[in-house]
A protein has these predicted regions:
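Charge-dense, intrinsically disordered terminal/linker segments
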Residues: 1-97
Length: 97
């Protein structure tokens, strides 16, 4: 009999999905973008994340799109961040699009 686990091949993400704190989730998203070779526009990140909505309560999601640059040149792509508030932790979904 074939085990179900051997048939399922889920993609391994380049960042940790579950975090104990909201700050940890945001820092992981920033590290993900930097690992891919992009530089984050700190002014844009501060305005949207730091001055934006408070951390999500249970069952709510905060979404952000942050400007990126590569080799000093602003890119059309953006870092998409979604942080979902769970009971005692936060779920991170981040990608570059």
């Amino acid at each position: 009999m074939i085990k179900l686990a051997s048939l399922i091949k889920e993609a391994k993400s380049d960042y940790e999905v579950y975090h104990k704190s909201y700050t940890s989730a945001i820092e992981a998203a920033r590290a993900y973008a930097e690992k891919k070779g992009y530089e984050i526009n700190n002014d844009d990140a501060f305005t949207k994340i730091g001055m934006g909505p408070r951390k999500p309560s249970e069952g709510k999601t905060n979404r952000f799109d942050i400007e990126l640059s590569k080799d000093g040149k602003v890119q059309r792509k953006k870092l998409q961040i979604q942080v979902y508030g769970m009971k005692n932790s936060y779920e991170l979904n981040a990608y570059i699009q």
